[in-house]
Amino acid sequence: MATNKFFKSLLFTLTIAISLFGLSIENSSAYPVFAQQGYSNPRAANGKLACANCHLNQKAIEIEAPQAVLPNSVFEVTVKVPYDTTRQQVGANGKKADLNVGGIVILPKGFKLAAKNQIPAEVKAKNKGVFISPYSTEFDNILIVGPIAGKTHQELIFPVVSPDPEKDSDVKYLTYPLYAGGNRGRGQVYPTGEKSNINSFGAVQAGQISEITTSEKGESNITIINSDGVKTSQIIPAGLTLTVKQGDSVKVDQSLNIDPNVGGFGQEETEIVLQNPLRIIGYLGFCFCVLLTQVLLIIKKKQFEKVQAAELNF
């Protein structure tokens, strides 16, 4: 257990370090790796992925994977995270920034991230600057990536190696489910439960806005006086566009700013078959027998036609 926690902490630190050194990380971030800190298993019993707890908007993704694979073979699982690259969102510092993307793939037990020497050169070129890692030592079949620049990585490619049932008795030749998730942009909730600045902030009480001031950091301080003369102040983070002005009357929970969220999270699932090579050989043998039978029938038919023609001539 202690080793697992140490691995998580080390992996988290390494990912953040890579982010700081600029391997395709930009100002506005989406961190799938944060899920490691709060969830031992990122997939809940109802099928919901942990990423959806922070990224509240739903956005579509696509998953591409082979229908069937052979044991001990390397293949690709591609998660497509499409979005309008011309759009920007509010960064943590309140400034406009491009969106980043992140992704997660939950493979069947026994399937793992392919080793560097197993990954084709073409995939290495596509994944240059991309750090893909297992979720934990316990769940090495779960792979995560991000944040990476969305403009250049709307397709997340996960190189995977399949297990060999001949070497692992826990693995069988079966059809397995495969789950994937992808997000673009920052989340609306931090892992601590606090709201980020990618939110619509509502009025804490009904009343009239008596004053709006702006701090040096760009934050808006809105003062609301209710009918009893009670004043409340609330701060709207920097970078958000207000929808109210001084003198306006507001209701409880009425939005005070335009919703800045342009991102979102989506998840999909598919199936993959771990195919027994003997079944393929058997199928090919069956096809050969059928083909041979058809050829022999045609030859026999030709011979019969010749015999009939000879008898008629006689």
UniProtKB/Swiss-Prot annotation:
Recorded GO MF terms: electron transfer activity; heme binding; iron ion binding
UniProt keyword annotations, A-Z: Chloroplast, Electron transport, Heme, Iron, Membrane, Metal-binding, Photosynthesis, Plastid, Signal, Thylakoid, Transmembrane, Transmembrane helix, Transport
Binding annotation for heme: 31, 51, 54-55
PROSITE patterns, sorted: CYTF
Subcellular location: Plastid, Chloroplast thylakoid membrane
InterPro entries: Cyt-f_TM (IPR024058), Cyt_f (IPR002325), Cyt_f_lg_dom (IPR024094), Cyt_f_lg_dom_sf (IPR036826), Rudment_hybrid_motif (IPR011054)
Leader peptide range in chain numbering: 1-30
GO biological process: photosynthesis
Cofactor notes: Binds 1 heme group covalently.
Cofactor(s) annotated in UniProt: heme
Transmembrane segments: 280-299
A GO cellular-component term linked to this record: chloroplast thylakoid membrane
Membrane topology recorded in Swiss-Prot or TrEMBL: Single-pass membrane protein
PANTHER family: CYTOCHROME F, PTHR33288
Entry function: Component of the cytochrome b6-f complex, which mediates electron transfer between photosystem II (PSII) and photosystem I (PSI), cyclic electron flow around PSI, and state transitions.
Subunit structure: The 4 large subunits of the cytochrome b6-f complex are cytochrome b6, subunit IV (17 kDa polypeptide, petD), cytochrome f and the Rieske protein, while the 4 small subunits are PetG, PetL, PetM and PetN. The complex functions as a dimer.
Protein name as catalogued: Cytochrome f
Protein source organism: Trieres chinensis (Marine centric diatom)
Gene name tied to this protein: petA
